From Swiss-Prot:
Gene3D superfamilies per UniProt: 1.10.20.140, Crystal structure of tRNA isopentenylpyrophosphate transferase (bh2366) domain, P-loop containing nucleotide triphosphate hydrolases
This enzyme's EC code(s): 2.5.1.75
Similarity annotation: Belongs to the IPP transferase family.
Source taxonomy: Bacteria, Pseudomonadati, Pseudomonadota, Gammaproteobacteria, Enterobacterales
Identification of the protein by name: tRNA dimethylallyltransferase
Keyword Magnesium: yes
Functional description taken from the UniProt entry: Catalyzes the transfer of a dimethylallyl group onto the adenine at position 37 in tRNAs that read codons beginning with uridine, leading to the formation of N6-(dimethylallyl)adenosine (i(6)A).
Cofactor: Mg(2+)
Residue numbers spanned by region Interaction with substrate tRNA: 42-45, 166-170, 247-252, 280-287
Length: 316
């Protein structure tokens, strides 16, 4: 697309960053002075009843800056990148039609990528094929299916852990339905985002600072009732660790503690480690991302002014 035709597109802002980097706080401040509406880009914040462990904005923050695509699903429900793209595009169109600018804020990079670049034409899920895969897994174990995936799609197998049944079964399902590998199909991009996007990423200048923030926040969450929140989910009886909601960082570790698999101290240690690993993956994604304006989360006023400088011009 030419620069001229790009300039005629409606405007949108991405505010990305690793967990515990201050994205939400910055977005809320920006909402006070810019004609923007916030859309959450977070695969954990979509779930109802998962507030403490996801660092969901509180009632006061949401009153000041309402977030769309927040609390839209029960934790028993699944939600794909395709679902997000569909919902985000609908919200963006509504915001743009009202004469305002969509500000998409979050840390789920796969959602941002799906929105920006479009999705490859993957086949829809087939319950019959999925049932056969699950039956085979019950008989032979998921490690045997992982070896099967290694034979047909070694690239996908290298990315998918043998203990990740959801992604493993999907990769095999795609191959059985289409005769093409997940790797082949994902190399075919879909429809690009019909917006002129200004992209920002916020993170601390040093990894040590981010690690400190993560550890402090995890302890704050525990002090704010994180364990009680997970116990309430556990008590429902219809949720389990194969579900994306319960695999969210922190939730999975507390779940293991509740089941008696690990001690409290081990749960805290694993929860902090898992959150740090998530942040590392998020930063790796962002470093390979083109067209990003980086912001230092340790300098909130400077970050705020930098965004205003760029966005102020497009918001006039």
């Amino acid at each position: 697309m030419s620069d001229v035709s790009k300039a005629s597109l409606p405007k949108a802002i991405f505010l990305m960053g690793p967990t515990a980097s201050g994205k939400t706080a910055l977005a809320i401040e920006l909402r006070k002075v810019l004609p923007v509406e916030l859309i959450s880009v977070d695969s954990a914040l979509i779930y109802q009843g998962m507030d403490v462990g996801t660092a969901k904005p509180n009632a006061e923050e949401l009153h000041a800056a309402p977030h769309r695509l927040l609390d839209i699903l029960d934790p028993a429900q699944a939600y794909s990148a395709a679902d997000f793209r569909r919902d985000a595009l609908a919200e963006m169109a509504e915001i743009t039609a009202a004469g305002r600018i969509p500000l998409l804020v979050g840390g789920t990079m796969l959602y941002f990528k799906a929105l920006l670049e479009g999705l490859s034409p993957l086949p829809s899920a087939d319950p019959e094929v999925r049932a056969k895969i699950e039956q085979q897994a019950a008989e032979q174990g998921w490690s045997a299916l992982h070896k099967q995936l290694e034979e047909v799609d070694p690239v996908a197998a290298a990315r998918i852990h043998p203990n990740d049944p959801q992604r493993l079964s999907r990769a095999l399902e795609v191959f059985f339905i289409s005769g093409k590998t997940l790797t082949e199909l994902t190399q075919t991009s879909g429809e690009a985002l019909p917006y002129q996007v200004h992209q920002f990423a916020i993170a601390p200048a040093s990894r040590e600072l981010l690690h400190q923030r993560i550890e402090q926040r995890f302890h704050q969450m525990l002090a704010s009732g994180f364990e009680a929140e997970v116990r309430a989910l556990f008590a429902r009886g219809d949720l389990h660790t194969d579900m994306p909601s319960i695999r969210c960082v922190g939730y999975r570790q507390i779940w293991s503690y509740i089941e008696g698999e690990i001690s409290y101290d081990e749960m805290v240690y694993r929860g902090v480690c898992a959150t740090r690993q998530l942040a590392k993956r998020q930063i790796t994604w962002l470093r390979g991302w083109e067209g990003i304006h980086w912001l230092d989360s340790e300098k909130p006023e400077q970050s705020y002014n930098e965004v205003l400088q760029v966005v102020g011009a497009i918001a006039d």
